[in-house]
């Protein structure tokens, strides 16, 4: 082609000497690029680990830059590896890994990650629960097109309300088909969002009915099923209740087919203040009519009631399937003190 001829002469094929000279000329810039990329990588890893120092939006920008750093390090490796190494099996392995990594980096930079599983819909309804204060959970019901494959109770999705913010993970807080369909036959699903971070604190003021929403998913296997030979124990704290709301909806008589393989369960729910908890009345109602039965036990922090791994082990001796969704500290405590025979299933949204 004309491009090859411009680079390598009229024949369009680089003589071996010219190719080696070209690689030799690249060695100095490749060395500098690799060195600076390595320093940037160390700094970005440190910032990623120290998440409290960085809000989500700047962290996301740094995260999106990771593929560029990988490509710089790949160039560094390709140019500086000894020529003799490329003829050895180790060189073939390195070349294959670098090629696959570079392809993945370019795929990410092009914005194609999760694209096939992304569905564009709109907000069907939005309301602030409880007293309507800025710290209360937000219920968002989304209407999705026919391309949405449906979900299973307990799954989550990545949701984008604002293109500048990117995707955020939220649990789907409704059972399949429990909300019916929109006016044009759209599938409806519910999100319950607690204003905890710099992004979610402003959603209640920014979301509007009819606003576009992109949902990628669904993902996850947090189905609360477990083995019939084990006690099924659910532990929820705060907004970690949302997957269990979906699981409980699936156990209602009107949608009993969604819980055909379910077993009786015992739900331990931890709340800061039971009297003002906007999710608790619905939780009690769902537990009262669930089939198979779900026994509810509430721990009110305002009354000094705390759930501990030791108390849980005493109440549920023997093998159990423990399903947990809530603050990382409580999850770590349950994991660290897990009694023999516990099988811990843990929902975690520590994405950074």
Regions found by a protein language model. Name each.
Residues 1-109, 180, 186, 195-352:
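FNR/FR-type flavoprotein reductase catalytic core
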């Amino acid at each position: 082609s004309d491009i090859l001829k411009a680079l390598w002469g009229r024949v369009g094929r680089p003589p071996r000497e010219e190719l080696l000279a070209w690689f030799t000329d690249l060695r100095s810039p490749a060395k500098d690029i690799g060195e600076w990329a390595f320093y940037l990588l160390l700094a970005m890893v440190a910032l990623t680990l120290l998440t409290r120092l960085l809000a989500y939006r700047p962290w996301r920008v740094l995260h999106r830059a990771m593929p560029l750093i990988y490509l710089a390090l790949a160039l560094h490796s390709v140019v500086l590896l000894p020529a003799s190494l490329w003829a050895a099996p180790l060189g073939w392995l390195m070349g294959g890994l670098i090629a696959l990594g570079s392809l993945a980096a370019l795929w990410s930079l092009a914005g194609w990650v999760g694209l096939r599983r992304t569905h564009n819909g709109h907000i069907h309804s939005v309301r602030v629960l409880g007293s309507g204060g800025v710290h209360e959970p937000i219920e968002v019901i989304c209407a999705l097109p026919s391309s949405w494959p449906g979900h299973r109770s307990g799954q989550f999705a990545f949701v984008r309300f604002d293109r500048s913010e990117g995707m955020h993970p939220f649990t789907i807080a409704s059972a399949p088909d429990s909300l019916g369909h929109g006016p044009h036959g759209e599938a409806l699903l519910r999100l319950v969002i607690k204003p905890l971070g710099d992004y979610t604190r402003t959603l209640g003021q920014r979301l509007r009915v009819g606003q576009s929403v992109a949902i990628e998913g669904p993902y996850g296997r947090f189905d609360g099923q477990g083995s019939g030979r084990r006690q099924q124990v659910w532990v929820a704290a705060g907004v970690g209740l949302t997957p269990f709301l979906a699981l409980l909806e699936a156990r209602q008589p009107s949608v009993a087919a969604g819980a055909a393989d379910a077993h009786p369960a015992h739900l331990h729910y931890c709340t800061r203040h039971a009297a003002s908890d906007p999710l608790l009345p619905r939780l009690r109602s769902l537990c009262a009519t669930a089939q198979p039965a779900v026994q509810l036990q509430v721990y009110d922090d305002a009354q000094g009631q705390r759930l501990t791994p030791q108390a849980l082990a005493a109440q549920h001796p023997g093998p159990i399937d423990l399903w947990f969704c809530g603050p990382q500290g409580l999850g770590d405590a349950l994991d660290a003190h897990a009694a023999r025979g516990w099988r811990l299933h843990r929902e975690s949204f520590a994405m950074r």
